[in-house]
């Protein structure tokens, strides 16, 4: 049936071309449907008739009713829809019969005419000019009721956008998030910068990178897993307040919260610490919610998230003890006991974990999903935070926070480690833990996803001022502000396996 409909559409296209119709390329719509609807929704039929308001619109036809010598079409654009009224006697001889009647759902039309309201009060355009701008050769899905197959929605996002206005609003909100972040950052005197997407050494996070090859230089390069080390080089160079919004890439698993290509915002502020950055993060998110949602509350799933109150703060160990009454503080200082706890929780551990990694596993398994209201978790173990400054109070933890909302991580920040010697030791320790290698000269034998960035150490040796940093996942933030459960629903074209 679909093949027959496509065949009919091609026959109509051939007929239109054969009879000398040229598809215009110079039609310029002056009005959009949403603005027209908002502006004239309260006008009466008599008011519109007397005003004789002329408009010019374009969009995709999504419905039609042909009634002899007149027709009603529904046109849709990104933000709304409007009805067209076409009468045969207003157009050239045979134009209505030969062409207008052969137009199909999905065709893109341009129209000019006067606004009026039908007897039922529907705002419409009485057309004095109408043109077929593009002929759709394939029919719209399910007679324009939308796509039901989830995979098809992701693979053919253009069809999903055509048939799903809610989806359009999600991506409009995503765009507003970018706009309002930049608005806030510029107001706070931050400079937006760009750092390399392809790097000689993929640093700033522990993740497996995508590898590419530069033919002229004959070297392997890596799509960045994080911009962090380059941004901190800029702080060394004298830029005190910077941010970047851009893509990062990690050659790892795909889930409802992870896409290999994702959008991050990173912020760095000299002469500040992680407490300052927590305060900054809190104010930024409060601003975004107010600007985008219109109030201080956000619905996500069954949860109502309140952004009006000051965000709750507690340490990693305090959070574990709060949600695990059977665990004692002394247990979290004993690797043997923590290994037993991890095993009891059913956590699949493929390699030996150190104390910091064990604590993090327990937290991820038992606490993270319970953090519904905005919560800063503080003081992470030094073993899982190689770029963070050690705490002045407890050298086993670092001045780091992660922000959790509605059960998942939204942001990560810390006081930056600016001790070059300590950073060098941490880099080497990270390599040793991953590969059981003690000799720096064997760096060529390391897996290519963990390498030692000697130039970054050199930069630190020139002096990094006391600095705090922040990373926010824009995709997850969009999920939160649009009430979506999957990261794929807030990315236009998520990564998928090729279809068979």
From Swiss-Prot:
GN (gene name): lysS
Location of the protein in the cell: Cytoplasm
Subunit comment: Homodimer.
PROSITE patterns membership: AA_TRNA_LIGASE_II (PS50862)
NCBIfam families in the record: lysS_bact, PRK00484.1
Protein's recorded name: Lysine--tRNA ligase
Cofactor: Mg(2+)
Keyword vocabulary terms for this entry: Aminoacyl-tRNA synthetase, ATP-binding, Cytoplasm, Ligase, Magnesium, Metal-binding, Nucleotide-binding, Protein biosynthesis
An individual GO BP term: lysyl-tRNA aminoacylation
């Amino acid at each position: 049936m679909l093949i027959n409909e496509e065949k009919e559409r091609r026959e109509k296209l051939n007929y239109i071309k054969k009879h000398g119709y040229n598809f215009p390329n110079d039609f310029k719509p002056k009005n959009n449907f949403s603005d027209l609807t908002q502006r004239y929704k309260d006008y009466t039929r008599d008011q519109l008739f007397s005003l004789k308001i002329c408009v010019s619109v374009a969009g995709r036809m999504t419905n039609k009713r042909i009634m002899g010598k007149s027709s009603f079409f529904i046109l849709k654009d990104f933000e709304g829809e409007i009805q067209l009224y076409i009468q045969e006697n207003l157009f050239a001889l045979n134009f209505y019969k030969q062409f207008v009647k052969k137009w199909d759902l999905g065709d893109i039309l341009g129209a000019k005419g006067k606004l009026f309201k039908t007897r039922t009060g529907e705002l419409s355009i009485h057309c004095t000019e109408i043109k077929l701008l593009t002929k759709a050769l394939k029919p719209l899905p399910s007679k324009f009721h939308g796509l039901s197959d989830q995979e098809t929605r992701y693979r053919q996002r253009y069809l999903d956008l055509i048939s799903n206005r809610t989806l359009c609003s999600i991506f409009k909100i995503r765009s507003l998030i970018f706009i309002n972040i930049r608005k806030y950052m510029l107001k706070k005197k931050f400079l937006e910068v760009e750092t390399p997407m392809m790097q000689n050494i993929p640093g700033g996070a522990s993740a497996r990178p995508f590898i590419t090859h530069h033919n002229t230089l004959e070297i392997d390069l890596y799509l960045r897993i994080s911009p962090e080390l380059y941004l901190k080089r800029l702080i060394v160079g004298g830029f005190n307040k910077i941010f970047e919004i851009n893509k990062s890439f990690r050659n790892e698993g795909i889930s409802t919260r992870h896409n290999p290509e994702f959008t991050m915002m990173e912020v760095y502020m000299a002469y500040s610490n992680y407490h300052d950055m927590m305060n900054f993060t809190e104010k930024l998110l409060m601003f975004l919610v107010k600007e985008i949602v219109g109030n201080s509350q956000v619905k996500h799933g069954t949860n109502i998230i309140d952004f009006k109150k000051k965000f709750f703060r507690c340490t990693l160990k305090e959070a574990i003890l709060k949600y695990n009454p059977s665990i004692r503080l002394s247990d979290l200082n004993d690797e043997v006991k923590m290994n037993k706890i991890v095993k009891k929780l059913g956590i699949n551990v493929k390699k030996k974990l150190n104390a910091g990694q064990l604590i993090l596993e327990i937290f991820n398994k038992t606490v993270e999903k319970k953090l519904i209201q905005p919560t800063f978790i503080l003081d992470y173990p030094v073993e899982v935070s190689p770029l963070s400054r050690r705490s002045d109070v407890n050298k086993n933890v670092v001045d780091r926070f992660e922000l959790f909302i509605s059960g998942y991580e939204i942001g990560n920040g810390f006081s930056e480690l600016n001790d070059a010697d300590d950073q060098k030791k941490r880099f080497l320790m990270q390599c040793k833990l991953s590969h059981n290698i003690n000799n720096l000269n064997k760096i060529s034998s390391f897996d290519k996803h963990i390498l030692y960035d000697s130039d970054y150490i050199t930069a630190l040796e020139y002096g990094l001022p006391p600095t705090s940093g922040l990373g926010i996942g824009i995709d997850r933030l969009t999920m939160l502000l649009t009430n979506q459960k999957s990261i794929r629903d807030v990315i236009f074209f998520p990564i998928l396996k090729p279809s068979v």
